[in-house]
Amino acid sequence: MSRKTLYELQAENVRKTYLFIVTFSLILFAIGYFFVWYFNWGLTGIVLLAIFIVLYNWIAYEQSDKIALASVGAIPANPEEYYVLHNIVEEVALAAGIPKPNVYIMEESQPNAFATGKDPKHASVCVTTGLLQMMNREELQGVIAHEISHIRNRDILLMTVVAVVAGLIILLRDVMLRSMWWGMGESRRRDKNDNGAIILLIIGLIFSIIAPLIVLIIRSAISRQREYLADATGAFIVRDPYGLASALEKIGSYTRPMRVTSDATAHLFISNPFGRAEKLFATHPPIEERIKRLKSLTM
């Protein structure tokens, strides 16, 4: 298999993002159309559904980075208070040939980090306070280089859009569950032969079961090879694979789960924020394997 150039990888990520948005739109329309038909909302319901899908796709494309940052409680890193962090981000961005991304801080003891945005000109890097406390300069530089590699490779667009879409799926799951319990209560007060309520209950139950699986499949669609590529690319940007390898060793030794995160955003982070090992549907390769590959690199 021939190696792909950076430009080919970037173009592939953009194509996958558009394909993902189109596929998700069709699935969402199919789900919405059922409710339009069931409640007999007619043409008005179809028009409103179409408007919602277009609006949501625009938000997912244009505002997904802001949503991702807000969902984890990230705040802008004060340049004076976090001078060293800003300095490292600027150095690595310059070496990678991209504009300096916005820098955010997340009040969290778990050492972790992620990048978000739609392109190198509209990107952000977020690190936890735990990461800053545990890492020395070389290790922090390695982590930042990994995240900036995601920005340069344009992984961030697909990763962030997937996070927003997965969030909607989880929200729909929760709405279905509430509707199901509400429907059960209502059905006891109505005629036992109310077939409509029974149908809604069945659909709600099915969706509540498959929704988590849908999220896992979506997350796994983001290839684990992207993490290997970002590790290697980051190491070459700073000419040092050992900084990131050492950082991953420290990150891997911390098993306490992150306080503020969800299945929708887990794939954004450099390491699994739930503090547990995953094999099936995992979006991150094993940290041990990542460290092994980094230490085998020659600069």
Curated annotation (Swiss-Prot):
Its cofactor is Zn(2+). It is a multi-pass membrane protein. InterPro entries: HtpX_protease (IPR050083), Pept_M48_protease_HtpX (IPR022919), Peptidase_M48 (IPR001915). GO terms for biological process: proteolysis. Binds 1 zinc ion per subunit. It comes from Thermoanaerobacter pseudethanolicus (strain ATCC 33223 / 39E) (Clostridium thermohydrosulfuricum). It is found in: Cell membrane. The active site is at 147. It comes from the Bacteria. This is Protease HtpX homolog. GO terms for cellular component: plasma membrane. Keywords: Cell membrane, Hydrolase, Membrane, Metal-binding, Metalloprotease, Protease, Transmembrane, Transmembrane helix, Zinc. The chain crosses the membrane at residues 19-39, 41-61, 156-176, 198-218. CDD domains: M48B_Htpx_like. The keyword Calcium does not apply. It holds the Pfam family Peptidase_M48. GO terms for molecular function: metalloendopeptidase activity; zinc ion binding. It is an enzyme of class 3 (hydrolase). Belongs to the peptidase M48B family. Its EC number is 3.4.24.-. Zn(2+) binds at residues 146, 150, 227. The keyword Phosphoprotein does not apply.
